[in-house]
Amino acid sequence: MKETTAESTIQLKPNHSYGIDLLKFLALLLIFNSHIDIAYGSYRALATGGAIGDVLFFFCSGFTLFLRPTNSISEFPNWYKKRISRIFPSVFAVAIIRCLFFDTHDDIITIIISWNDWFIPCIMMYYVIIYIIGVYARQYIKHIIIGISVIGAVYFAIESQNIPYNMYGNTYLKWILFFNFMLMGAKMGICFPKKTESLTKLLIQAFAALVLYYVFYFIGQRSTSDLRYIQFISYIPLFILVQRLFMIGEHPKAQAVFMRKRVFPFIAFIGGLCLEVYLVQYYLITDRLNHLFPLNILLIFAAVVITAYFARCLARIIRQTFQTEPYNWREVVKMY
C-alpha cells in the first residue's frame, strides 16, 4: 500500500488497513438500513442489506484478529479477556441508557446474554473457535471454510423443507455460514498486503456479485418448489462480494477518494461505532416521522449515531473504572 503525501489526504499509518475502515462504515450503513423497515413506510423493500452488513463486520473482525499471531492456547484467557473488555462495557452502557431513557429494566443475566439477541452470543462463540484455529489449524483455513460450507449445505437442505425459509433470517444456518466470513477475513489478514488489481475490474466484479446474490436469494426465498435450493447459492456471490469490497477499499485509487481529510474522519467515526449502533438502534427507530420521508431516515440515523457515540463514551468510562490507571478523558471522548 503506497504512502500518500498529498495535502488533501490523511497521513497513512504503516501496517494499517484502511480498507477495513471502509468496510466497517459500509457494514454499519447496511445493518442500520435493514432494521428501519417501518421508517420506509410504503417502500419497505428498500430496508435490505442486513446480511451483507453482518458478514462485512465478521470479515473485519477476523482480519484484525489475525494481524497479531496467536501462538499458544495458554494465552487464550488473556486474549479472550480483551474481547470481553471491548464488547461488554458497550453492552452494559447501552443497558444503562435503556434503563434511564427508555424505561427498560433487565436483570444482569438478560443483559449479559444481550437480551436474547443473536449477534453478541454468536461473535463471542466465534472468538473461541477462531482462536483455536489460529493456534492449531492456521494453515488449513481454506479446508475449514470448505468443510463449514458443506455442513451449511446439509443443514440448509434439511431446514429449507419448512417453507418459506430465509437462510439469512432467524436461523442457526447463518451462525454456521457467517463464521466463514470471519475466517476469510483472517486469511486476508495473514496475507495482507495483497497485490493491486484493476479498480474497474474489481468494481464490475463486486457489482456482478451483488446482483447475483440478490437474484439467487429472492428466487430461492420466494419459491415453494425445488427452486428454493437456489437460495443457498447466494452464499457464493456474497463471499465474492465481501472479498472484492475489501480489495476495492485497499486500492490506491479508491483510497484517494475516501481518504480525503474531509471524508475519512466521518467514515472512521461512523465505522468505529458499528457495535454501539447495532445495540442502540432498536430503541430509536420509529414510524412517527414517516410524514417527513425521506428526511426521517437521516434524522433517525443521526439520533442513532449520537446515542451510539455517548454509549461508547460511557463504555470507555466503565472500562477505565476497572483499570488501575487514572481516567484518560481524551481517550473517552476520542472520535475515532
Segments and roles (model prediction):
Residues M1-Y155, S160-Q161, K195-F207, A254-F269, ...:
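Membrane-cytosol interface segments of multi-pass membrane proteins
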Residues T64-L67, G134, A186, I190, ...:
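Short glycine/serine- and small hydrophobic-enriched flexible loop segments
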Residues Y172-F179, P193-A303:
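Alpha-helical transmembrane segments and terminal signal-anchor/GPI-anchor hydrophobic tails
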Residues F32, Y168, M188, D226-Y229:
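Extracellular, surface-exposed passenger/stalk and repeat segments of large secreted bacterial proteins
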Residues V150-C191, K195:
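Long hydrophobic alpha-helical segments that form multi-pass transmembrane helix bundles
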Residues D107-I112, N170, D226-L227:
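Extracytoplasmic catalytic-loop and juxtamembrane helix elements of membrane-embedded
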Residues S61, W118, F179-A186, I236-R244, ...:
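Alpha-helical transmembrane segments and their membrane-interface exit regions
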